[in-house]
């Protein structure tokens, strides 16, 4: 069984006031020390005071990112950074790009350029009881690639920051007053059927 721990931080970006950057820092491991089970999907959950300004930033298409790498994406489309640490050792940089999917939905592409990995994250309103604390989530579904789940690589730590500025706009904003606790979380679903929810609060800067 996977065990998850995580923290989140929120800081003001270069524009200040309502403009922020949100970082999720998640760790996963097993009691036995074995490789964690492969993920099926994740949802990054954002406080109900937070908005994500996908319409104010240029977009990078998945096909462009896959064919040309980050160099092919237009200026202003990069909206986040991060780092992946892998089970068994090694790490790699992570980058986040604003995108529009073929079905018209908006969201981001989280990529590990060194591995050629691209993860689709659709921006969606949360549903059910999650609406008590959250308004939006970035929903990531890990597509099967023919590799058996037990043979897939696994991360022991994944850090991702959502935040950027472009022509006077911030990618992430919060209308909460300074000092108010912000709810942030990560919902996880693994190929074993296990479901986890890691939640916490951080003061609005």
What are these regions (language model features)?
Residues 1-205:
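Ser/Thr/Pro/Gly-rich, low-complexity intrinsically disordered stalk/linker tracts of secreted
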């Amino acid at each position: 069984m996977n065990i998850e721990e995580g923290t989140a931080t929120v800081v003001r970006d270069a524009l200040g006031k309502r403009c922020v950057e949100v970082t999720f820092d998640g760790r996963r491991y097993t009691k036995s020390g074995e490789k964690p089970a492969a993920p099926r999907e994740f949802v990054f959950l954002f406080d109900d005071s937070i908005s994500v300004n996908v319409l104010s930033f240029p977009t990078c298409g998945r096909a462009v990112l896959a064919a040309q790498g980050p160099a092919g994406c237009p200026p202003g489309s990069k909206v986040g950074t991060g780092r992946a640490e892998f089970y068994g050792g090694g790490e790699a940089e992570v980058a986040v790009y604003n995108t529009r999917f073929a079905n018209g939905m908006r969201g981001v592409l989280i990529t590990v350029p060194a591995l050629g990995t691209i993860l689709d994250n659709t921006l969606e309103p949360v549903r059910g009881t999650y609406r008590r604390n959250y308004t939006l989530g970035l929903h990531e579904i890990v597509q099967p690639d023919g590799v058996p789940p037990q043979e897939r690589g696994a991360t022991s730590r994944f850090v991702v920051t959502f935040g950027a500025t472009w022509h006077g706009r911030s990618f992430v904003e919060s209308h909460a007053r300074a000092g108010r606790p912000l709810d942030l979380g990560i919902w996880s679903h693994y190929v074993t059927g296990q479901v986890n929810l890691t939640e916490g609060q951080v003061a609005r800067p």
